[in-house]
């Protein structure tokens, strides 16, 4: 072979379909396992749902314009760790679980009820089953890996044919060669092993694969001597290696990608040699061509995904659109949808291209377990993919013969099986998985055909799920911002705003802070702005909620400066603050004003204390202790009686400042030490903490404020990014907006005081990263346009208002279900002296109903339109219809005339007459 031969796949394009072609309204979940979390046959797709032990089942192709219906199959009493479809029977599914068993299921045709029990049960094993794969040539043979053991099963007898020699550590991956003769494994002991299971249980070959013991995978190429492995090197960089089993001491070639902590999922099509690499928790697919003969791993294309990938699978080659030159199709599993991503080779003609689509393995097995174990190496007959020459043989495995299925009845709670549901179109939005101790196993859940039972199974949906965020018109922007300080500490929001103005730290020396008037949008002058000069670098700043003209600024000199901005705005440079608070001995982290008491301010510092100040007196009144490391964030409870902190020492604390300087409660916080934030939610009954896990994945943790020691009630993993998510909570709607500095996406979740705790809503995405994102007071919202949140987005050179609205049909009515009475947050409920003396206040409430608008709850019901019988529409025609028919007839009559045209009778002139 010419090593410089040009590849026919060099122009391959990855195409993402429009959202209408996505399989939406799903609730996907991921388990801590080595599986891919989604698999496909030529007819069905199976994927992990957010209920432990439950799979979602959906047809691969839609029938006409009907929406694909998602059903749910309760498989196990614990997490489903891996799954696989038979290569010969599209409706035979095998599942592996953390309950240490393997089950085989006969799935019905679309429209029929799912089975209430498995067709076969294998196991139990000594550990949770991590890997599962059917044999490529023999029906009824499959391998499973659990702990350090790998078994090859004769499923017809429900007995293992052999158990391979024990590995040195956890088996992370296992795969059959294409001819079914060999079996390869990757292990946490960093060894890559090749077995001939029919010859001996010991490894025929073994070699060090990847220098790091993190998650490793392998897949075989179309040529049985070659395989591809993925893993990590000693520098924690992700790498891909191509191996030849005949020269197994070293890899033929290797490829280093990046230092992402996410393991790579290799998806290889043996016929084309195209290799797709997908990282869980990422939003990008890499496509390479594996060419063992050269040898090389040649890059083909990259695809940037619209959502985070939770799992990935290849669609069988027999299900591809060959006339459209679709050479590969990847199914991306995200939290809320399954996205089919097609890889096409551009060709000028619409025809079947033999060079792109060689014959592929058919769906009729070559042997059975007995014949294969006896030594048969007969291969599966290959079939043409040409639509005109394609045979359509059908094969039904004997492992789980089809039976006459009847709708399953609800099973009593506690049974390991019995989870079934009739097909129904899921219209509620997906809710991310909450992996906290409050979510128990769903193995005993039963369903009835009623929609109410289905909704109770799937959980509630948020009325804000269709929220729409949009940047307001440019006339409301403040532009030409220059010299912003983008290096404020991670504990600070970066800027602050109230209903009148915005305070933004500048990069210039002297700790300067610019104050911009929101009522005066437009382009700022090119000349220097009047500023507040603090003399030292600014670490945090906050507006007094009860005095819109007072700004508190914390500096690196451990001092807090209080500035008073004139009512008409800052007209000149101010160098003398109204007051200076001293007491901290180290740099200050953050500032938080009391939500109800006037002149009360809390501050945290590198001296590991939280101090509470009486601004009227200008002195420290209370000091909170007990922190052993950096304080990431603090927050007052809505009633102002308690204060919560989250710390780098991995602890979450609640204080009663007026009662004791020591914490009232302590509990485990986020595992990661990169940063965290805390906010009180659900009327002060819960604490929401945003932070990182041990793998640097951003996550949300929800704690009961009365039981911190018990750990989080729910945990939600989001994505991998370096910046801490900054939460902005709206107590009126129960919505939290989350984004980080440098992000382009704002997450929206509705928080519930019970399971499922998190209800996902539409997120807001911007084309470029923002430097800060702050929620404005509720009174800034345009209630008539059903605007439930107004925010400010800080960009590199501008400040933009962002409105979040809810689509409603009858906007002429006041949407009282969206706008309850709101707290008058700009009026104090008591003084600092009263609060420090032990008194508690209650805030006043204010209705947001505009004058002259009627609440939608009191709106008269619209009478349904009377519909005429269909015969009326068939027999009667309107005047407009009659006119259109007459014009069409006239045009048709004129168009059918074949008389010669006038210009046809004209005679031309000789060429010499033109001179």
Swiss-Prot record:
The membrane-associated form is phosphorylated on tyrosine residues. Ubiquitinated via 'Lys-33'-linked ubiquitin chains by the BCR(KLHL20) E3 ubiquitin ligase complex: 'Lys-33'-linked ubiquitination promotes interaction with EPS15 and facilitates actin polymerization at the trans-Golgi network, thereby facilitating post-Golgi trafficking. Deubiquitinated by ZRANB1/TRABID. It comes from the Eukaryota. Keywords: Actin-binding, Cytoplasm, Cytoplasmic vesicle, Golgi apparatus, Isopeptide bond, Membrane, Phosphoprotein, Protein transport, Repeat, Transport, Ubl conjugation, WD repeat. The modification Phosphoserine is found at residues 453, 456, 905. The keyword Repeat applies. Pfam families: DUF1899, WD40, WD40_4. WD repeats lie at residues 75-115, 124-163, 166-205, 209-253, 533-573, 583-623, 626-665, 719-759. Its main location: Golgi. SUPFAM superfamilies: Quinoprotein alcohol dehydrogenase-like. GO terms for cellular component: cytoplasmic vesicle; cytosol; Golgi membrane; trans-Golgi network. It is found in: Golgi apparatus membrane; Golgi apparatus, trans-Golgi network; Cytoplasmic vesicle; Cytoplasm, Cytosol. Residues 396-456, 850-915 are annotated as: Disordered. Residues 399-413, 420-450, 859-869 have a biased composition (Low complexity). Interacts with clathrin adapter AP1 complex. This interaction takes place at Golgi membranes and not AP1-positive endosomal membranes. Interacts (when ubiquitinated at Lys-463) with EPS15. F-actin regulator involved in anterograde Golgi to endosome transport: upon ubiquitination via 'Lys-33'-linked ubiquitin chains by the BCR(KLHL20) E3 ubiquitin ligase complex, interacts with EPS15 and localizes to the trans-Golgi network, where it promotes actin polymerization, thereby facilitating post-Golgi trafficking. May play a role in the maintenance of the Golgi apparatus morphology. This is Coronin-7. It comes from Bos taurus. The gene is CORO7.
């Amino acid at each position: 072979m010419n090593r410089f031969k040009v590849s026919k796949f060099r122009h391959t394009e990855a195409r993402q379909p429009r959202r209408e072609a996505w399989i939406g309204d799903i609730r996907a979940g991921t388990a801590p396992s080595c599986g891919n979390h989604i698999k496909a046959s030529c007819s069905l797709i199976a994927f992990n749902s957010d209920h432990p032990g439950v799979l979602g089942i959906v047809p691969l192709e839609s029938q006409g314009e009907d929406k694909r219906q998602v059903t749910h199959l309760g498989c196990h009493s614990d997490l489903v760790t891996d799954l696989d479809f038979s290569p010969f029977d599209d409706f035979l599914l095998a599942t592996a679980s953390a309950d240490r068993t393997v089950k085989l299921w006969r799935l019905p045709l679309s429209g029929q009820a799912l089975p209430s029990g498995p067709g076969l049960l294998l196991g139990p094993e000594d550990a949770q089953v991590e890997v599962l794969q059917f044999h490529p040539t023999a029906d009824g043979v499959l391998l499973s890996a659990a702990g350090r053991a790998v078994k090859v099963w004769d499923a017809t007898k429900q007995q293992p044919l052999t158990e391979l020699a024990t590995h040195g550590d956890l088996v992370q991956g296992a795969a059959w060669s294409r001819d079914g003769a060999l079996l390869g494994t990757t292990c946490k002991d960093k060894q890559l092993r090749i077995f001939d299971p029919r010859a001996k249980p010991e490894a025929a070959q073994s070699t060090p694969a990847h220098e790091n013991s993190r998650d490793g995978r392998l897949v075989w190429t179309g040529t049985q001597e070659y395989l591809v492995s993925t893993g990590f090197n000693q520098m924690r960089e992700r790498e891909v290696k191509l191996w030849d089993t005949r020269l197994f001491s070293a890899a033929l070639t290797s490829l280093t990608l990046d230092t992402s902590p996410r393991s790579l999922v290799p998806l290889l099509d043996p016929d084309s040699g195209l290799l797709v690499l997908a990282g869980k928790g990422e939003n990008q697919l890499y496509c390479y061509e594996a060419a063992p003969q050269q040898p090389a791993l040649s890059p083909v294309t990259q695809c940037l995904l619209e959502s985070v990938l939770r799992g990935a699978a290849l669609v069988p080659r027999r299900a591809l659109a060959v006339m459209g030159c679709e050479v590969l199709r990847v199914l991306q599993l995200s939290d809320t949808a399954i996205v089919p991503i097609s890889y096409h080779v551009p060709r000028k003609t619409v025809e079947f291209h033999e060079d792109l689509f060689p014959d592929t393995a058919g769906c009729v097995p070559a042997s059975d377990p007995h014949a294969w174990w006896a030594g048969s190496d007969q291969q599966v007959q290959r079939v043409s993919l040409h639509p005109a020459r394609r045979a359509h043989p059908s094969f039904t495995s004997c492992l789980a013969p089809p039976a006459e299925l009847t709708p399953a009845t609800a099973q009593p709670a506690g049974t390991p099986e019995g989870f079934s549901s009739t097909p129904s179109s899921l219209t509620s939005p997906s809710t991310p998985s909450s992996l906290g101790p409050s979510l128990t196993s769903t193995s005993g859940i039963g369903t009835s055909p009623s929609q109410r039972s289905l909704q109770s199974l799937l959980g509630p949906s948020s009325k804000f799920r269709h929220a729409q965020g949009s940047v307001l018109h440019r006339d409301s922007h403040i532009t030409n911002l220059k010299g912003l300080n983008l290096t404020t500490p991670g504990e600070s929001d970066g800027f602050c705003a109230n209903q009148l103005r915005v305070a933004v730290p500048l990069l210039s020396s002297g700790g300067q802070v610019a104050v911009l008037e929101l009522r005066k949008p437009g382009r700022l002058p090119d000349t220097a702005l009047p500023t507040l000069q603090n003399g030292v670098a600014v670490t945090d700043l906050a507006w007094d909620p009860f005095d819109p003209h007072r700004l508190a600024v914390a500096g690196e000199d451990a001092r807090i400066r209080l500035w008073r901005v004139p009512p008409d705005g800052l007209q000149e440079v101010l160098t003398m603050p109204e007051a200076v608070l001293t007491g901290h001995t180290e740099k200050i982290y953050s500032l938080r004003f009391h939500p109800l008491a006037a002149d009360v301010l809390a501050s945290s510092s590198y001296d590991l204390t939280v101090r509470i100040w009486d601004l009227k007196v200008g002195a420290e009144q209370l000091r909170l202790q007990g922190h052993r490391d950096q304080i990431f964030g603090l927050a007052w409870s809505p009633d102002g009686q308690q204060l919560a902190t989250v710390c780098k020492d991995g602890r979450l604390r609640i204080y009663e400042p007026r009662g004791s300087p020591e914490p009232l409660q302590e509990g485990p916080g986020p595992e990661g030490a990169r940063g965290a934030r805390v906010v009180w939610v659900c009327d002060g009954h819960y604490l929401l903490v945003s932070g990182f896990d041990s793998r640097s994945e951003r996550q949300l943790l929800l704690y009961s404020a009365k039981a911190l020691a018990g750990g989080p009630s729910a945990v939600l993993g989001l994505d991998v990014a370096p910046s801490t998510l900054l939460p902005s909570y709206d107590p009126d709607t129960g919505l939290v907006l989350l984004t980080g500095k440098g992000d382009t996406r704002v997450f929206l979740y509705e928080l519930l005081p019970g399971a499922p705790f998190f209800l996902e809503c539409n997120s807001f995405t911007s084309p470029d990263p923002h430097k800060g994102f702050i929620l404005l007071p509720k009174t800034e919202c345009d209630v008539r346009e059903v605007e439930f949140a107004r925010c400010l987005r800080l960009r590199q050179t501008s400040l933009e208002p962002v409105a979040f609205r809810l689509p409603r049909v009858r906007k002429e009515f006041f949407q009282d279900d969206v706008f309850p009475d709101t707290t008058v947050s700009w009026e104090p409920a008591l003084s600092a002296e009263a609060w420090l003396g032990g008194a508690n206040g209650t805030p006043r409430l204010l209705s947001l109903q505009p004058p002259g608008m009627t609440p939608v709850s009191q709106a008269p019901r619209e009478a349904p339109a009377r519909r005429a019988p269909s015969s009326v529409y068939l027999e009667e025609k309107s005047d407009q219809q009659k006119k259109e028919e007459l014009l069409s007839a006239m045009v048709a009559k004129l168009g059918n005339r074949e008389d010669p045209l006038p210009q046809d009778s004209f005679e031309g002139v000789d060429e010499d007459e033109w001179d």
